[in-house]
Amino acid sequence: GLSLVLLFFFFFFENMNQILGGIMATQQIEDPVKRKIAEYALITVSIWIMVVGIYFFKFPNNFSFGGVTGFSSVVSRLTGMNASDFTFAVNTGLLVLGFLFLGTDVGIKTVYSSMLMSFSLSALDRFMPMAGTITDQPMLELIFAIFLPAIGSAILFNIGASSGGTDIIAMILKAHSSMNIGTALLVVDITSVVMSFFVFGPTTGLYSSLGLMAKSLVIDGVIENINLCKCFNIICDDPDPICDFIIKDLNRSATIYKAQGAFSHHSKTVIMTTMKRSQAVRLRNYIKKVEPTAFILISNSSEIIGKGFLSN
């Protein structure tokens, strides 16, 4: 079990940029059938990332970061009610809310995600049963229990899906308020973490509190990195070849306006454009080749509203 987990970590971190690039490429696929297939492939990968963190690190250590499973553990301890029955009932109700407030497409994605996660966890429990924790370092395992599910959740949120449970409430709050996803998750999960102090003791409660706060930060950080774009302000003498490259090779557009140097009083052209990180590298290299004296300002932005970007 440990060797497979380590192999997964190596593959994931080694291919992080390609994974994030694949997420962005999914949003740009024009064919609706191919885009849908790519989205469900991403959902599958995201769920598996979450399952690894939950099964190998969260469950063996009894970490509770909120969510339906956190509430289920608390309710089961307090009332004796079967935790699985409680989880199923609450998830069913939340799925109905998802269909009502978020639309059919999100609801179908969430049903698929929930079923895949349940099946994957059951399969691991049957074929790779965990006799105990992987290491004797709870803080180390807490990091992976936070990091992997948070990455999976962030990817799901970014393509308009969720793994079910309280993620649905977070998406509803995000859709109908100004809250970001991480803050919304913190709000809906904090109650069960507070209850864990009284039910499972201060040690578990403190670990769970730390995990919950870190999870919301990781989710927002991953979403921001997925959506990260580069904004260019290019001050040049000959804008035509640069604009042709932006339009024809990068399939982007740009805005051009005239300017004047404050010191030289020479006329200049300013090109303003925005694109994905992989395209930004190509544009920067091209400008250096065709006009080495051009002055280039490059800045980051993760929230862009307009055609061709996520925040339409």
Regions found by a protein language model. Name each.
Residues L2-E14:
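Hydrophobic alpha-helical signal peptides and transmembrane signal-/tail-anchor segments
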Residues M16-I23:
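Compositionally biased, low-complexity peptide segments typical
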